[in-house]
């Protein structure tokens, strides 16, 4: 059970497989942080495709899958939306997600995904 001072983020990964090898890795399996702390969720990917899309989703305890962002491989701009920010680094094949000033409402399973 979560208390008001504890946020738990469970990390999972999704890999959309095509005829070319693709892989998404989220090494962190579970993260616990104190409320109001910042937390960064790491996502590293591998693909041979030159054009691809990266996604972040979250699934809160209520069960619905919530779309957060889609990033095109040709658009390496970072993005900030409220307390959420995404850092896309094509050179290191990473697409990390940061929650600033975490809140109990942020408790969820977070998914990073890759698609052609």
Swiss-Prot record:
Sugar-bearing residue positions: 96
Membrane as UniProt keyword: yes
Pfam families: V-set (PF07686)
Localization per Swiss-Prot or TrEMBL: Cell membrane
InterPro entries: Ig-like_dom, Ig-like_dom_sf, Ig-like_fold, Ig_V-set, TCR_variable_region
GO terms under biological process: adaptive immune response; immune response
Keywords on record: Adaptive immunity, Cell membrane, Disulfide bond, Glycoprotein, Immunity, Immunoglobulin domain, Membrane, Receptor, Signal, T cell receptor
Function: V region of the variable domain of T cell receptor (TR) alpha chain that participates in the antigen recognition. Alpha-beta T cell receptors are antigen specific receptors which are essential to the immune response and are present on the cell surface of T lymphocytes. Recognize peptide-major histocompatibility (MH) (pMH) complexes that are displayed by antigen presenting cells (APC), a prerequisite for efficient T cell adaptive immunity against pathogens.
Protein name: T cell receptor alpha variable 19
Organism, scientific name: Homo sapiens (Human)
Species lineage: Eukaryota, Metazoa, Chordata, Craniata, Vertebrata
């Amino acid at each position: 059970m979560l208390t008001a001072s504890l946020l738990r983020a469970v990390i999972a990964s999704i890999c959309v497989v095509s005829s070319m090898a693709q892989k998404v890795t989220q090494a962190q399996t579970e993260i616990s942080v104190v409320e109001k702390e910042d937390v960064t969720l790491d996502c590293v990917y591998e693909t041979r495709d030159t054009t691809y899309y990266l996604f972040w989703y979250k699934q809160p305890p209520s069960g619905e899958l919530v779309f957060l962002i889609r990033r095109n491989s040709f658009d390496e701009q970072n993005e900030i939306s409220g307390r959420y920010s995404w850092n896309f680094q094509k050179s290191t094949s990473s697409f990390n997600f940061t929650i600033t000033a975490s809140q109990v409402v942020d408790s969820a399973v977070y998914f990073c995904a890759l698609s052609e």
